[in-house]
Amino acid sequence: MRMVLSSTAPLRPEARAAMIEATGITGNPSSVHAEGRAAKSALERAREEIATALGAEGADVIFTSGATESAALILGGRDLACAAVEHAAVTAWCRDDLAVDATGRVSVPEPGRATLQLANAETGVLQDLPQGLAASDLTQAFGKVPFAFNWLGIQAGFVSAHKLGGPRGIGALIVRRGTEIEARIKGGGQEQGRRAGTENLIGILGFAAAATAAQNDLDQGIAEKMSEIRDSIMLRLESGAGMVTFPGRESRS
């Protein structure tokens, strides 16, 4: 039994099938001929599917190589605060001066000048994201716990496909429509001029399939079932292993 999927998750069958089918799409999404338009159509359908899974209808979904690149795109060059519990891809760009209490909760006095993860990969702590938060690492929560970008009230979020059973090397940055972002990779103007380079269509279609499958699992109650399994394991460890500490257990769903 595989106990930890925080680092990466096995490729979902739905993602594998979508990627194999995508190898038959030969056009470049930036081309205006028939093959290019077909590729562009597939790309935009995938974008809509991922937006739906994220509850981000009406927001901009910008494809990147993963959450690390997405974090650099939205956090780089900004004077934002974060906590030491964030992933290194976040702390590399921010001041880690936000306080963390004994339950793993983070205090954010100025949300518009801070970034805060929704879920922690090591402790499982879920944060209450304040309205107007500048950005959030949604990677560990996406596909595992129910949420919708639109009701989180944040300005931007980022995710990676491989955390929920999609392929490695593909992710997305989600921002409120019209948000100004300075491209860090410049060239052909892809992704609305925010991230140049021909889109990884095979990876993107695999990402969309995995995101849709993960959302279907959530709709069928997988999060509640996993919480029951987790609680059962914790009780067994506490009863049979002597003194056991579970950091942040008060802050999990």
Tell me the role of every PLM-derived stretch.
Residues 1-253:
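Pyridoxal 5′-phosphate
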